Amino acid sequence: MTNIRKTHPLIKIINHSFIDLPAPSNISAWWNFGSLLGICLVIQIITGLFLAMHYTSDTMTAFSSVTHICRDVNYGWLIRYMHANGASMFFICLFLHVGRGLYYGSYTYFETWNIGVILLFAVMATAFMGYVLPWGQMSFWGATVITNLLSAIPYIGTTLVEWIWGGFSVDKATLTRFFAFHFILPFIITALVMVHLLFLHETGSNNPSGLISDSDKIPFHPYYTIKDILGVLLLILILMMLVLFSPDLLGDPDNYTPANPLNTPPHIKPEWYFLFAYAILRSIPNKLGGVLALVLSILILMLFPILHMSKQRSMMFRPLSQCVFWILVADLFTLTWIGGQPVEYPFIIIGQLASILYFMIILLILPAISLFENTLLKW
């Protein structure tokens, strides 16, 4: 009798994806983040579902319902903070996952890569709408500022913003629809994740050397299942340390004040994981230009397969490209820092220089360095 694992139509799919999957023998811990993102998504959906059981999406009661969850619901505070800090862990894993893809040239699997970029957009949209739901000061003003950016679109901008708001300002209609979208998007993300994996398993995983590894494959289970479990334990350890010791470390104190349309907070800023894009947005004095730069700062990832000029796939054997890559990482840290600072000298000029450098590295410096490294190969 053949094993049910290999014959059953449904179990067979799981078997080919997680058990008998041929994987390169040399993939490092940087390849753990895919599974960690899967765990993050599961944590977010489960905690989010339990929060939705007690949350009310009405402007009058939203803030109170979150307070009620934290004070009166059994372990409500735990669920709420796991969900809030789970989002931070999600983005940490996302950024490391994308960074791994850039460093090791994984973007040459362009279907997998482009779906990954769409996933990044979807997760960012979900996180933004989730931040609006507690209806604190930063929720309200964040929603107002970010949705208002769409008014920069010529001709249809103002109509579009009022259509999204469901009125002439961010109000009850906006909150209700954001809750609806915030609830449905994670399931759309789950479907996209399956497509992401489908395309990945068409080609097989990349590896640190960037070379074809067909001649040296090992089964995913038990080797990488054990390795992934270690990553999951570390992820849960860090998440629970955040949740139980400093749950508000990454939040904004302004969000503990109920939303008030008559009182603007002194510094409107999004959650930390959007600060780099927010800094790029603010560094351009023109509204439409800023919005375009904001969208392009993420959309530019789709250009990496086209901009890849090197004869080698990975950066493992390209020290000059490695230097430029780490300068890009430092630049993103700088942008994140600037995004959280007030709009005044010297932060404005630092933000503008960091934004220019970000686009320069991706569009000019990295391809140029790659071409230069190709000439060095001929020596």
UniProtKB/Swiss-Prot annotation:
GO terms for molecular function: metal ion binding; ubiquinol-cytochrome-c reductase activity. Its cofactor is heme b. It is found in: Mitochondrion inner membrane. GO terms for cellular component: mitochondrial inner membrane; respiratory chain complex III. InterPro entries: Cyt_b/b6_C (IPR005798), Cyt_b/b6_C_sf (IPR036150), Cyt_b/b6_N (IPR005797), Cytb/b6-like_sf (IPR027387), Cytochrome_b (IPR030689), Cytochrome_b_C_euk/bac (IPR048260), Cytochrome_b_N_euk/bac (IPR048259), Di-haem_cyt_TM (IPR016174). Heme b b562 binds at H83, H182. A ubiquinone binds at H201. Heme b b566 binds at H97, H196. Pfam families: Cytochrom_B_C, Cytochrome_B. It comes from the Eukaryota. It is a multi-pass membrane protein. Heme 1 (or BL or b562) is low-potential and absorbs at about 562 nm, and heme 2 (or BH or b566) is high-potential and absorbs at about 566 nm. Component of the ubiquinol-cytochrome c reductase complex (complex III or cytochrome b-c1 complex) that is part of the mitochondrial respiratory chain. The b-c1 complex mediates electron transfer from ubiquinol to cytochrome c. Contributes to the generation of a proton gradient across the mitochondrial membrane that is then used for ATP synthesis. This is Cytochrome b. It comes from Tamias senex (Allen's chipmunk).
